[in-house]
Every structure is written in structure tokens, then in C-alpha cells.
């Protein structure tokens, strides 16, 4: 296994000499061949060498990365712009740890349009997905996200208005097999489920909707006005009236904008940031036709570099995701960028027209940047307040449990069942005091003794913790990156004792606690009395949040499993209706009640269900029918 390059200067120099003085993308990898960082440069050798000259001057985050680099690879490109575009795609695909400059703050919503589907949907989400692991060649990589937006209330108002003005797909699955639902009858949906509109025609409608979230509402209104005039000339007054209503609704979107510029031809973005001890809050204002049409917000690691470096990285990540028509002619900057020519060339080539980058010094442009900065400072204050509360809770918890360092990873476990039936367990994970949902996990209880009428939370918890730590209990694994500092069990001394019997060999390496309900007592292994603690102190409140989240996650999975069993228990009693056909029925009708309401003809249209089986299903739910 290769050792870090910084510990082998001869090999480091040999690797650096192999890098060309040309534009391209470089990969920094650790000793396990994992990609730590992907970067781009117009001179690969010079850029990569700069990491190893004085690592301490790079900041704590990048210094930690440099001491892990064991291998360097690269791809040469013809131009700097090609390098930036390739870097953006590779970062999406691999998501390297040290490239995650922009933090995933669920506070900010996006609008998603699923262009990967024949009839795309449009909806609001707080989680941005990169399809197929971020592979830009995958179908789901075609989906488009607009945002993240600051004002979620206004965003929901805008989308609600859009859905009233334009007939759009309303449901992820059809409600009926042979007819459209009520949304079609009231003009909210064009009958997507029954193919009453072609995919091409429907996409034309959605492309108009996309223009709204691209900040091109004025351009869309002009198009609709021309189409309305043509419809009136063709005596198609119904279409002309519909277009008129759409125009009026779109004009209403911009009526209450508080920011407007005297030049109604202006198309520019303005970006500024505020940097604190841990976070950097970035705001980007989108000005189109002299009006503020969008406020985007980003959160970055304050240790990512200088203010200019953070701004450059945010702009690169943002504009790599947008379409060429969304790039403005001018971008106003709060601070100079370290590589402005790189970004300017990339944006100009992508837009097909010159894009200017300016740090304004006076008059209206400087006032606009000052306003963006004030908004960034307000957002930073919110972030700092939330971060301070979390830090206080971690410090209090470390003191309460006698830990030498602040707990980084806390795992919470809980069991859910009804008298032993459909028994499941959950694991939730908090990283640095915040939920890390990518590490959550469900468990099915495998113990055959746990069944209806015979519940055993002690045995269930012991089983789950044994499965979680099996490799380490058997001495087959080294301490991994996902090793928890604290394991929290929902329960009292009994639940804790059951888990202690399993994890006894590991108790010197981790802290095991249980949190009982009602009095919120905290128990430690081999101690009869609970820890003296105030239920309202910050550390205990953090444990309560972990415990409650584990309970919620387990309960939701239990309800899902129970509902699935109850649905299938009905269908299992119908002769000839196997597992696959049951899945088709439930996918089509979504519930037993809708299956019960369906006619034999509707049932027969389900894939794999012919007229004879449909009649049998119908008779099962309607035994008195002829």
C-alpha cells in the first residue's frame, strides 16, 4: 500500500515532474485509491506542486487533505474552459470529500423538472439528487434543478400559480387505468396518464414553464403575446383567451418585486458573501430586465480559502449546472476572483457571447453588491446562531459523559412493533450534532422468537447491535471511519444490559448510554443509578433529539411494513394472484380500497391480469355481486 507522498519526497518529485504544463483536470487520491479531490488548472504541474510547498498555508482543511495524498492522476484538455466543464462533471460523478465546498443545507428549496421522464414532473424539493451517482451520462442526470431559493413561501406561491396557468402533470402515477382523473376535467392536467397529449407537445408547455425559473419571464410573455395575436388573427378565440390569462398571471409574478433598476434591459447576477468562524454564507441575486427575479443562497465551509476563492468555486459550481440561456451578460462581484480569466472564458464560450466579471466601486452597481452583502450577513447570523447551539450541546454532552473530545458520530437505535408483529429496528446517525440521513438504516428483526404475541425488545436490540459490530466483535476489522463515539439506546437499564452483554469487548473504545422516557434518565453500563443531569440541559436535549429521531424512523418503517403485510394478506387469499401480479395491482391502484372500487374491466387492464382473474378479484371484494 502506498504511503502519503509528503512522506516520500523522492517519489513526490518524480510524480510532479510527470505532470504537464498544460490545462486539464487532476485527481488527488489516498492510499486506498479513493479520490480525495478533483481540481482543474491551466498549468497542471504548477497547480499541483503548490499544494506541497507550504501545506500549513492552505488552511486546516486542505492541509489535512495534503497529508493523505498518496497518488496523483490527471487528464489533459485542449482549453481551460474544457477543463472547467470536465471538472464539474467529474465532481458530480465522484462527489469527493474535499470537493464538497457547498454544504447541503436543507433549508433552501429547489424546483426540479424531471426531463428524464417522457412526461416530466415539476415539484419543489430540498434534496438535490445527482442521478446514478452523479454520472452525467445517465438518464436522471437530465433532470434540472433550479435554485436553491431563499424565500420558500414565495417559491411555493409561484409554483402554485404556474400550475394554475399551465396544464401540467399532477400525479406520479395514474389514478385510473382507462380514464383521466378530476385534474383533467378541471383543466389542471392535459391527460398525461391516458396519452391525450403527445410527449413532444407536453414538453413544449414545460419548456415555457422552465423559462420562468430561468429568469426569462419577460421573454416568455413576449412569446405568448405574439402567439395570442396570431390566435386572434386565426379566429381561434378560445386559445387567445387562454394565452391572455397566462400573460396576466405571469405579469402578476413581478408586480411585488421590491428591487428594480432604471435600465429595464439589464441582465446581470450579483454575488456577495459573509464569512464567519465556521461558515460562509453566499447570496446571488438574479436581475433580469431590470428586476430582481431570484435570490439564491449557498453555504460553504469558511476554511475553504479566501473570500475570492470561495466566490469563484460557488460561481463555477452554479454555472456548470445552468443552461446557456440562464447565464447573464454581466456578473457583479464583491471580491476579485483568483482566476477570473478562466471563468470568463468558460462562461463566454458556454453562452456564445461575451460575459463580463466586474467588481463595482461606485454608484448603483456598488449599492446592489452592498445590498447582497447585507443579506448574506443576515443569513450568516442565522447559521452562526444554530451552529453555536449545536456546539454548546456537544460540549455539554462531552462533559456529562466524561469524554476527552467532542463526540463526532452519535448512533441511536430503537425497536418498533405491535405485540411482536412486524418487528423492525432503526439506526440514526448524527454527525457533529446534526442528522446525517445518508447513514440511516432500517433492520428487519430476524429472531424467530420475536413474533405476534411474543415481543422481546432486549433480544431485538442485542441482535441489531451484534449485526452492526459483528466484524469487530470477531476481531476481523480495524476501527473504521464510521466508528461511533456514542451509541444511544432508547430504553432503560434492561435494554442497556442486553446490549452490554453483546458489546462488552468494545466498551473501552466507545461510549454506550441509554435514555429512558418519562424522566429522561441517562444510564451507563454497570451503573445502577442514572447520571445526575437536568433534562433541559443542552447535552441531554441533544440525546433526546437522537432518541426521538430513532423512534420516528423505526415507527415509520414499522407502519410501512405493517401496511404492506395487510395489503398482501387480502390479495394472498385470491387464487391465482401471485406476488408479481399483486405488485402490479398495488402499483396501479395504490391501495386495497381503490382495488375494491375498481370494475372488472379496469382490473383486467392491469399488466398480467386478464378478464378471468379480474372477475375472480372482483368477486372476492364483492361476494354478493352476480
From Swiss-Prot:
Signal peptide: none
Subcellular location: Cytoplasm
Cited PROSITE patterns: GIY_YIG, UVR, UVRC
Residues annotated as domain GIY-YIG: 21-100
One biological process term in Gene Ontology: nucleotide-excision repair
Keywords, ordered alphabetically: Cytoplasm, DNA damage, DNA excision, DNA repair, Excision nuclease, SOS response
Subunit structure, interactors included: Interacts with UvrB in an incision complex.
Ranges for domain UVR: 218-253
Chain's gene name: uvrC
A single cellular component GO annotation: excinuclease repair complex
Family in the record: Belongs to the UvrC family.
InterPro entries per UniProt: DisA/LigA_HHH, GIY-YIG_endonuc, GIY-YIG_endonuc_sf, GIY-YIG_UvrC_Cho, RuvA_2-like, UVR_dom, UVR_dom_sf, UvrABC_protein_C
Source organism of this protein record: Thermosynechococcus vestitus (strain NIES-2133 / IAM M-273 / BP-1)
GO molecular function, one term: excinuclease ABC activity
Name of this protein: UvrABC system protein C
Pfam families for the chain: GIY-YIG (PF01541), HHH_2 (PF12826), UVR (PF02151), UvrC_RNaseH (PF22920), UvrC_RNaseH_dom (PF08459)
Keyword DNA damage: yes
Domain of life the protein comes from: Bacteria
Stated role: The UvrABC repair system catalyzes the recognition and processing of DNA lesions. UvrC both incises the 5' and 3' sides of the lesion. The N-terminal half is responsible for the 3' incision and the C-terminal half is responsible for the 5' incision.
PANTHER family: UVRABC SYSTEM PROTEIN C, UVRC/OXIDOREDUCTASE
Amino acid at each position: 500500500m502506498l504511503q502519503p507522498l509528503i512522506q516520500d519526497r523522492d517519489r513526490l518529485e518524480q510524480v510532479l515532474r510527470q505532470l504537464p504544463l498544460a490545462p486539464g483536470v487532476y485527481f488527488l487520491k489516498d492510499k486506498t485509491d479513493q479520490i480525495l479531490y478533483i481540481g482543474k488548472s491551466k498549468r497542471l504541474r504548477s497547480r499541483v506542486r503548490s499544494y506541497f510547498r507550504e501545506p500549513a498555508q492552505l488552511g486546516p482543511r486542505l492541509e489535512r487533505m495534503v497529508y493523505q495524498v498518496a497518488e496523483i492522476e490527471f487528464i489533459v484538455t485542449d482549453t481551460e474552459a474544457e477543463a472547467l466543464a470536465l471538472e464539474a462533471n467529474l465532481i458530480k460523478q465522484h462527489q469527493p470529500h474535499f470537493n464538497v465546498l457547498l454544504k447541503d443545507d436543507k433549508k433552501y428549496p429547489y424546483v426540479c423538472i424531471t426531463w428524464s421522464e417522457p412526461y416530466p414532473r415539476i415539484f419543489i424539493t430540498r434534496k438535490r439528487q445527482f442521478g446514478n451517482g452523479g454520472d452525467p451520462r445517465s438518464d436522471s442526470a437530465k433532470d434540472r434543478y433550479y435554485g436553491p431559493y431563499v424565500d420558500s413561501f414565495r417559491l411555493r406561491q409561484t409554483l402554485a400559480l404556474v400550475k394554475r396557468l399551465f396544464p401540467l402533470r399532477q400525479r406520479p402515477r395514474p389514478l385510473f387505468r382507462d380514464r383521466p382523473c378530476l385534474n383533467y376535467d378541471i383543466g389542471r392536467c392535459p391527460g398525461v396518464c391516458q396519452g391525450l397529449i403527445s410527449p413532444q407537445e407536453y414538453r413544449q408547455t414545460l419548456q415555457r414553464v422552465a423559462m420562468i425559473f430561468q429568469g426569462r419571464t419577460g421573454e416568455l410573455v413576449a412569446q405568448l403575446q405574439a402567439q395570442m395575436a396570431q390566435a386572434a388573427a386565426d379566429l381561434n378565440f378560445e386559445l387567445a383567451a387562454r394565452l391572455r390569462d397566462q400573460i396576466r398571471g405571469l405579469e402578476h409574478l413581478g408586480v411585488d418585486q421590491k428591487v428594480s433598476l432604471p435600465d429595464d434591459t439589464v441582465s446581470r447576477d450579483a454575488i456577495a458573501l459573509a464569512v464567519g468562524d465556521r461558515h460562509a454564507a453566499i447570496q446571488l441575486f438574479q436581475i433580469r430586465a431590470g428586476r430582481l427575479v431570484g435570490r439564491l443562497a449557498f453555504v460553504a465551509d469558511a476554511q475553504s480559502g479566501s473570500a475570492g476563492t470561495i466566490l469563484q468555486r460557488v460561481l463555477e459550481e452554479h454555472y456548470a449546472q445552468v443552461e446557456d440561456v440562464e447565464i447573464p451578460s454581466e456578473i457583479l462581484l464583491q471580491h476579485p476572483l483568483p482566476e477570473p480569466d478562466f471563468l470568463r472564458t468558460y462562461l463566454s464560450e458556454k453562452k456564445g457571447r461575451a460575459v463580463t466579471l466586474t467588481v463595482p466601486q461606485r454608484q448603483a452597481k456598488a449599492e446592489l453588491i452592498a445590498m447582497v452583502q447585507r443579506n448574506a450577513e443576515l443569513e450568516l447570523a442565522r447559521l452562526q446562531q444554530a451552529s453555536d447551539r449545536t456546539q454548546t450541546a456537544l460540549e455539554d454532552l462531552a462533559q456529562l459523559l466524561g469524554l476527552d473530545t467532542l463526540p463526532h458520530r452519535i448512533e441511536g437505535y430503537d425497536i418498533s412493533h405491535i405485540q411482536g408483529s412486524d418487528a423492525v429496528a432503526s439506526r440514526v446517525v448524527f454527525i457533529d450534532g446534526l442528522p446525517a440521513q445518508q447513514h440511516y438504516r432500517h433492520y428487519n428483526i430476524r429472531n424467530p422468537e420475536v413474533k405476534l404475541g411474543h415481543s422481546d425488545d432486549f433480544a431485538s436490540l442485542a441482535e441489531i447491535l451484534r449485526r452492526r459490530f459483528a466484524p469487530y466483535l470477531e476481531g476481523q476489522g480495524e476501527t473504521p471511519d464510521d466508528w461511533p463515539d456514542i451509541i444511544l439506546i432508547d430504553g432503560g437499564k434492561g435494554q442497556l444490559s442486553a446490549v452490554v452483554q453483546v458489546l462488552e469487548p468494545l466498551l473501552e473504545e466507545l461510549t454506550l448510554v441509554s435514555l429512558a422516557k418519562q424522566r429522561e434518565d441517562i444510564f451507563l453500563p454497570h451503573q445502577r443509578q442514572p447520571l445526575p443531569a437536568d433534562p433541559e440541559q443542552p447535552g441531554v436535549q441533544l440525546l433526546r433529539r437522537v432518541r426521538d429521531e430513532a423512534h420516528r424512523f423505526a415507527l415509520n418503517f414499522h407502519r410501512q411494513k405493517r401496511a404492506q403485510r395487510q395489503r398482501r394478506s387480502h390479495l394472498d387469499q385470491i387464487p391465482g394472484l401471485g406476488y408479481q401480479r399483486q405488485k402490479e395491482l398495488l402499483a396501479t391502484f395504490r391501495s386495497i380500497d381503490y382495488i375494491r372500487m375498481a370494475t372488472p374491466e379496469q382490473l383486467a387492464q392491469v399488466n398480467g391480469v386478464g378478464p378471468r382473474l379480474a372477475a375472480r378479484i372482483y368477486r372476492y371484494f364483492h361476494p354478493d355481486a352476480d
